[in-house]
Amino acid sequence: MRPMSRRSLDWTYSLLLLAIVLLSWGFVIYASTVAARRQLQKEFPDKFF
């Protein structure tokens, strides 16, 4: 693998960090919606969510 310049290395690391942050926030939002739906099904078992 050929050596990368400092600018492209910084750009790659920032892009990787952004992808990690977006994935973690997506997981947090997904988990909270699943927990909220589970709580609603527990409180209102006759409704469909």
Swiss-Prot record:
Keywords in alphabetical order: Membrane, Transmembrane, Transmembrane helix
Cellular compartment(s): Membrane
Transmembrane segments: 11-31
Gene expressing this chain: Smim27
Presence of keyword Transmembrane: yes
Top-level lineage group: Eukaryota
Membrane topology: Single-pass membrane protein
GO CC annotation, single: membrane
Protein name in the entry: Small integral membrane protein 27
